[in-house]
């Protein structure tokens, strides 16, 4: 007799953690406060509640699907790991120079958002690949070893590697990875040829840096989550919602956590599209208000609008170009820092403002 499918859905937000159990046609749900220091504890508490409602034990769960804003919040709040960038000589400042676009064309005092890594965290090495993948300047292993030794001495936890045109020929990045694995076996490593193998170095470098920046945090969290769920008897496959609205394995998510940016909000947009399809509605505006943020997504023909580049932490009235570009498939939505728990304050001009600070789950 085939075992009945029992699925657990979990969404961790800035204020609440929502847990839903699906068994056949029956749904059981609960809401618990997010536990910031150990988010997995809120999941375990919520799982215990819905299992009690359904009168089953965690061992009967056959699949867990998890959405989270932890990756996004780590980037916005800049509380990731100490990360180094290794890039092609002459391209150290690509992420600081940005592109020629200006998000406020006539503002003579325009202040650009600072890059995720300061200049002294960005290292260069002699190498150059042509656009067709031919080696223009070969890379020297001894130079790599010396540079990795310097990075190790500086106490970096994570390393991002982004070379020019590595999406065509990744040989130089692979050699750096080989040396890092020998000299710094405990370091987290992100290669642009794996994280974002496409042209446009500004977006590619930013995406790779973001992945490296949050990788130690997310890999540690996902490892704790798996162990905690296993200890409670839930030893089923765990999947995570990615930014494009699909799911990826826990192992894949731990390796490429940048794909979890907008993981939680993407789930809300997908659900809204499902409701639109059920009722045959072609034009829908999805609105998802949480305790910390509110998200809006346009859904046309029962399909959420998607994009190939997403900006995290827009700093200038949410204008395009004022954030950090992440080059991943993503459900296109507008997110603002105003939710049910947003805090009111008086700014420097003595005007009343609401958000983006939130009371969260620990006001």
PLM features: residue spans?
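N-terminally biased helix-coil "hinge/interface" segments that flank
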Residues: 1-363
